[in-house]
Amino acid sequence: MNIKKQLIIPCTLIGLLILIPIYSVVVNYFKSASTLSLKSTLTEVNLFSHLGKIVDIKDFKDTPTLLFFGFTHCPEVCPTTLSNLLNNIELLEKNKKNYRVLFVTLDPERDTINILNDYLQNFNSSVIGLTGELNEINKFAKNWNIYWEKVLEGDGYTINHTATVFMINKKGNFAGTIAWGESDKSIELKLKKLLNL
């Protein structure tokens, strides 16, 4: 019994030593994300849409936006995320709310304008693909605290990356996130709030 009591304090301290840094990282992440805006990050870079047009922040004025980073060779996470988002939004489309989904490639080496254009034919016209020079993509992704890493795979490579969807309100400011694997009910509630339904 005494041994158990003696272990409680050390174990508690060890637990706190582990949890405090994790908590700090999470809090700092959301603090930095909450100060982001689409305007401040898009105007710093030169990106092109899948239609070959230079991206202009004016195109997204007064439009709620969902921002997602991925790549066209992504086998599961990217197509599933885009499909789930659009399926949930379709349930709300009867309200005729305008919105945009920005799909930013983390693989501009392969994801040219033409490749992005072909890939996005699988989704509806609300999805806009963005690509550009690698340094421009890197800058934009880092501004949104995106983790990504090229991983060799067979004769080619894949990319491990953050699978979070960023919600941006019609003022262009960060309004929350949708996590990979989040339930449809949770996504629906968040989208209703974003779209003011």
Write out the residue ranges for each language-model feature:
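N-terminal targeting signals for export/organelle localization
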Residues: 1-44, 197
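Short loop/turn microsegments at loop-to-beta-strand junctions
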Residues: 42-43, 65, 162-163
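Short, acidic, Ser/Thr-enriched surface-loop or helix-capping motifs
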Residues: 49-50, 169
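Generic structural signal for well-ordered beta-strand positions
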Residues: 55-56, 175
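Short active-site neighborhood of thiol/selenol oxidoreductases, capturing the structured segment around
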Residues: 58-81, 85
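Structural microenvironment flanking redox-active thiols in thiol-disulfide oxidoreductases
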Residues: 82-140
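Thiol/disulfide oxidoreductase modules built on the thioredoxin-like
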Residues: 136-190
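C-terminal alpha-helix
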Residues: 190-197
